[in-house]
Amino acid sequence: MGRLLRLEVENFKSYRGHQIIGPFEDFTSIIGPNGAGKSNLMDAISFVLGVKSSHLRSTNVKELIYRGKILQRDNTDFTDSSNPTTAYVKLMYELDNGEQREYKRAITPSGATEYKIDEEIVTFSEYCGSLQKENILVRARNFLVFQGDVETIASQSPLELSKLVEQISGSLEYKSEYDKSKDEQDKAVNLSAHSFNKKRGINAELRQYQEQKTEAERYQSQKEKRDSAQLVYLLWKLFHLEKSISSNMAEVTRLKADSIQLIERRDENTKEIEKLKEKEGSIRRNLLAFDRKVRKQEKLIASKRPELISIAEKALESKSNLRKIQRKAAEIEKDYSDQASTLQVLENQLTSLSAAEKEFLKDMQEKEQLKGLRLLPEDKEEYEGLRSEADKLNSNLLFKLQTLNRNIKVTSQSKDSLTSIVGDLESKIKSLHESVSSLDTERADLLAKINEKIESLELEKHDQQKKRLTYSELFHKTQELNEELQSCLQKILEASADRNESKQDAKKREALYALKRIYPEVKGRIIDLCTPTQKKYESAIAAALGKNFDAIVVETQAVAKECIDYIKEQRIGIMTFFPMDTIAASPVNQKFRGTHKGARLAIDVLNFESEYERVMISAVGNTLICDSMTVARDLSYNKRLNAKTVTLEGTVIHKTGLITGGSSNNRSAKHWDDHDFDLLTQTKDRLMHQIGEIEYQKSSCVITESDTVKLHSLESEISLLKDKYTVVSRSVEDKKKEIGHYESLIKEKQPHLSELEMELRNFVKSRDELQIQVEKVEEKIFSGFCKRIGISDIHTYDEIHRTFTQSFTQKQLEFTKQKSLLENRISFEKQRVSDTRLRLERMHKFIEKDQESIDNYEQNREALESEVATAEAELELLKEDFASENSKTEKILLAASEKKLVGKRLVSELTKLSGNITLLESEIDRYVSEWHAILRKCKLEDIDVPLREGSLTSIPIDDVSNSGDITMGEEPSEPVINFEKFGVEVDYDELDEELRNDGSESMASVLQEKLREYSEELDQMSPNLRAIERLETVETRLAKLDEEFAAARKAAKNAKERFNAVKQKRLQKFQAAFSHISEQIDPIYKELTKSPAFPLGGTAYLTLDDLDEPYLGGIKFHAMPPMKRFRDMDQLSGGEKTMAALALLFAIHSYQPSPFFVLDEIDAALDQTNVTKIANYIRQHASSGFQFVVISLKNQLFSKSEALVGIYRDQQENSSRTLSINLEGYVE
């Protein structure tokens, strides 16, 4: 193989000007710093070898021309105004024979590329062909690996790998031819299959027509039998129809004669009922007037009751307050009375004390004079001298006596004080016992009041809870009714959107409601009493009813007249009434039933109660509802039926032929929706009435402010009473404790009192002894004095004088003390009485004020009660008058009811007779129609019926209206019946005696069964009567298809052979490459991955998804590094993937290898060990026939190369520059 010698570039990418790069040895490494232009060198090699610019990191070739700035010496850069507009890359290649060849690719100023071989311009195809001869495949790019291609190959899908092998093998060039021949084969095969299927279908059709020929012959024989049986059945049917018509006509004549008598009796009874109705109408008007007055009076009473309840509640509250104030005033008055009594007692006591004091002074003066205690001055002087002498003699005794008297006095005072204390304690105990007794009584009263108030509170709570429960129930019920009302209002709102009711219509509707309330005999509008059987008939029925649509149905003519008078009085407008007792209704013409399958009588598509049948017949008559305008025109204009026809859209064809109406102006059909709207309105009124009643009931269950105040008042009173009860109970307990304390004090002081009494007795005894001694001395000294002044002894004088003086002083002191106490007590009690009187006066003012309010409330209540009583009395009188008038109505109604029963019985009998007549006439009409229909069928189907007279040609093809055949006047006594035969007399001689005598259903079933059997056999045959003609046509087509099938089969065979030839070429090419790559991949991978530790290396192999046509499927690449289990490629590490991808690249390159292999940084993702392995592999396989050019940044790789091309950046020129060195002369 040849080899790459050097490159010459000029103005290509980062290489400015003309530069020579090389020479390139068997293993040349391109090194240099990042950004120096290594990859641009790779792009230059790719460019000169014909690779598209899109693979060279550019969108067009002009971008490959050098563009750069030149740095000047003064460190300023400028753009060269003469930027190059052309560029080229030249590759010097040495052939096997040593001859050199020059490949050059240039970029012209226009942006085009120019290819030259040895400076001779060639085409791209010639250029690529020359390179291909040297195994340099431009499209497969088997000579280079771009930066990142290794990682891309490692992550390729099986289909992408298969496509890569196709490119390498050259089988891809057969793809378009393969696809084209495959399409041609598929089309040819499909055409052949289609021809075969057509031939098979024609064969089946041929067999079918052969079978149909036999079937047609058998069908003709069976048809003759069926026609014979049909003729017998039709003759039997015609015979018995004529027989039934004759017998029914005789029966109709008899029944109509009977009905005349019933009509006369019915008319007499109706006149009597009319008279009663006139009376009833007058009384009913009076009842209506009374009813208005009663309602007005009830409304008046109802309006007064809330005010009456309010006044009663206020009066009750005022009375409660008054009772409280009165109780408080009574307590204050009692206190005032007690205080006044106490004051009076105290004043009486003061008066008595003053009188006693005066009496005492007077008494003391008298006693002093009586006892002679007053001495003369000289006697008194003598007495004083003698007393001084005696005192000197008795000084020691007197000292002792004074000491004893002092002790007696002290002891006596202590005893008196202690006695007083005990007395006070006893008095307090007595007072406390009285207070405890009073408090116990008060506590019992309080407890009774508390229980009474609690009972009242519980009763009030129970009443309020009952009100709450009732209110809650009514509230929930109101909610439910409101929800239902809301739903109803929503429906009314939705219906109102599509409803356009005029004021006049609304007025009429309200008038109808009023008439129904006044007159029970008012049944309602015709529209409300009937509904179409299906919604599609609504417009048609509305048009059929016409002006009778809003007509009102009443029981009698008398009621109708009263209703007319009412609407005249109210000025409502025009309204039509149908009295049920006098309405005239002609029977429905039965012949119209079955006239056309697309038409039916209007009366037959209405649902209504049986009692309204005559009304409905009178309203719609013989009107026919037609499915379409075509049917309506056919019946009205072609068949000339004497009846009104209406289409489903509401278009009316009148008897006169005039056409009116239609869906555009027929709004009457919406009145059925109006009926639903009326029901919704009635429901709304009912719900609102119920809600109003509940709201009225709720008003009586509402807990008013007075109820709350009353409850709080009771609770407050109970709380106060309980507090007072607690205070009283605590006071009782305190007083009992105080009694116990006082009793214990008395027990403590009693022993001390006894001791003082004993001590006092001893002192008195000692004093008496000393006193005797003193008296003896004094008797000696005062003996002469006593005799002179006339006293027995001096001791008596001294005792009387001393006692009198002491008694006077002590008594006078007691009077002063008691007077002071009474005066202070009186002053205090006077102040208390004054304060209590003021409180009492205020209470009396409050009582007067509340009493005045109560009197006002009572007056108002009595006035309202009087008004209510008067109104209720008037209401009772009105009700009595109403009842009186109602009793008159009931009597009239009873009499009218009896007459109505008679009338109903007569009407029932007449209806029964009319029904029988109608039924018989309907049967006659049906029999006649059926007789005509049979003959019409015979005429249309060419059935040869034997005739004695006439011809079937006289029978009209279209059905004829029975309005001229069977008619009724106003009374059933005027029958006009005619059986039109059109001059035809059927000959029944062929009908045997048994069939003439037996007209039963069983005979009909036998004849029909026999006819049905023949018909079913004929129906099952379904012969093709043109089978013989079609058989010849099919045979001709079959011969033609045989020729087409042979040609299609031959074309399919040729297409398949062409396809197999292309397929085989593509398969051989692909299989050759795959087999080679598959054989090489494992040893190459082993060589790349082996090491001293793992001398065998790893394992790699390829598998095909599709063994028959492998290029249609994928190729799976499996690699197992040394000493590792099998894994998918995406589970290998980055280095393992790179090694596997390189092994695959080397294996692919080994198939039709190019003379040189350019690799761009394939070692980027490898560690040092794997880089060394790659370097060793390249070193071992680099030779004169297999040249490696490697771009690398790792010294483990480029250090193994034979030559180095260094690339650096010339900053001054702003261009990439190269340096080359041969390493063969250097020792490793």
UniProtKB/Swiss-Prot annotation:
Q: Which GO terms describe its cellular component?
A: chromosome; cohesin complex; condensed chromosome, centromeric region; meiotic cohesin complex; mitotic cohesin complex; nucleus
Database matches in Pfam families: SMC_hinge, SMC_N
What's the superkingdom here?
Eukaryota
For this UniProt record, the keywords arranged alphabetically read as follows: ATP-binding, Cell cycle, Cell division, Chromosome, Coiled coil, Mitosis, Nucleotide-binding, Nucleus
Q: Where does ATP bind?
A: G32, P33, N34, G35, A36, G37, K38, S39
Q: Which InterPro entries match?
A: P-loop_NTPase, RecF/RecN/SMC_N, SMC, Smc1_ABC, SMC_hinge, SMC_hinge_sf
Location of the protein in the cell: Nucleus; Chromosome
- SMC hinge domain boundaries: 522-635
User: Record's domain comment?
Assistant: The flexible SMC hinge domain, which separates the large intramolecular coiled coil regions, allows the heterotypic interaction with the corresponding domain of psm3, forming a V-shaped heterodimer. The two heads of the heterodimer are then connected by different ends of the cleavable rad21 protein, forming a ring structure.
* Full protein name: Structural maintenance of chromosomes protein 1
Q: Which organism is it from?
A: Schizosaccharomyces pombe (strain 972 / ATCC 24843) (Fission yeast)
Name the lineage.
Answer: Eukaryota, Fungi, Dikarya, Ascomycota, Taphrinomycotina
Gene name tied to this protein? psm1
